[in-house]
Swiss-Prot record:
HAMAP family: THF_DHG_CYH. This is Bifunctional protein FolD. Catalyzes the oxidation of 5,10-methylenetetrahydrofolate to 5,10-methenyltetrahydrofolate and then the hydrolysis of 5,10-methenyltetrahydrofolate to 10-formyltetrahydrofolate. It catalyses: (6R)-5,10-methylene-5,6,7,8-tetrahydrofolate + NADP(+) = (6R)-5,10-methenyltetrahydrofolate + NADPH; (6R)-5,10-methenyltetrahydrofolate + H2O = (6R)-10-formyltetrahydrofolate + H(+). Homodimer.
Length: 285
């Protein structure tokens, strides 16, 4: 078996064109253009690349984007003060604090301070809680984007045994809720999980997000499984790989996402979808 590649770049391009049309329509009707505020703390090269991509896509589809960069030793109060100003800015629909953030900054306090209706990353307790209650509001970008990929590929998820490898607040936990909403029987594995291979072997749908290059080999995967690789890891030779060994997994899976070019582009475009949703649903005036 040779897996069908789920091309995240192609799907993201379709969504991008759709967003562009919606913005053109808003302009024709003299409606306000959505605004996204991006906050970067420190000089993490990967984070700087991600921020540039997000701002670039904003420009492509006609969004307004504002960008703030702070040194790594910034006082938490300075970030909270900026967020308060952005919360009260009627031209800003979405606020994004790029992860990771330095240890002296309280993750929970920062994301709790963003107004839920401007939390386009979907990390505010209100938004994560709403997802758990089967009443999703603004949803975490990567998990929501993965569901979008499955829908575009016309994969029917109801009744599938889904295994989420990784239990982070950013991907694993919200993804498990998305999988439940999608009708899957869902298992979440983490660092304390015993016999991980057993769980993976039984997965019809496998989502992997642990940050370990080529960790999961094709031998572990069920024949005909759907494999979604969220990992993005840079090797010593400069090459980028996922958490799944793509070559061996492709021989067993029915569908698989590549790295790069899979989940990454969808995550970025989903951020803009969330920003437009926030504008239309919560901030029209």
């Amino acid at each position: 078996m040779s897996a069908i590649i789920i091309d995240g770049i192609k799907i993201a391009k379709k969504i991008e064109l759709n967003l562009l049309k919606k913005i053109e329509e808003r302009e024709k009707n003299k409606k306000r253009i959505p605004g996204l505020a991006v906050i970067l703390i420190g000089k993490n090269p990967a984070s700087e690349i991600y921020v540039k991509r997000k701002i670039s896509v904003c420009k492509k589809v006609g969004f307004i984007s504002k960008y703030w960069s702070f040194p790594i030793n910034v006082d938490e109060k300075d970030i909270l003060n900026l967020i308060e100003k952005l919360n009260n800015n009627i031209n800003i629909d979405g606020i994004l604090v790029q992860l990771p953030i330095p240890k002296q900054i309280n993750y929970y306090k920062i994301f709790s301070s963003i107004r839920p209706d401007k939390d386009v990353d979907g990390f505010h307790p209100y938004n994560t809680g709403s997802l758990c209650q089967r009443n999703p509001t603004l949803r975490a970008c990567t998990p929501k984007g993965i569901i979008t990929m499955l829908n575009y590929t016309k994969i029917k998820t109801h009744g599938l045994n889904a295994v989420m490898v990784g239990a982070s607040n950013i991907v694993g936990r919200p993804m498990s809720m998305e999988l439940l909403l999608a009708g899957c029987t869902t298992t979440v594995t983490h660092r304390f999980t015993k016999n991980l291979r057993h769980h993976i072997k039984n997965a019809d749908l496998l989502v992997v997000a642990i940050g370990k290059p080529n960790f999961l080999h094709g031998d572990w995967i069920k024949e005909g499984a759907i494999v979604i690789d969220v990992g993005i890891n840079k090797l010593k030779d400069g090459s980028i790989v996922g958490d799944v060994d793509f070559k061996s997994a492709s021989l067993k899976a029915a569908y698989i996402t590549p790295v790069p070019g899979g989940v990454g582009p969808i995550t970025v475009i989903t951020l803009l979808e969330n920003t437009l949703e926030a504008c239309e649903k919560y901030h029209e005036f």
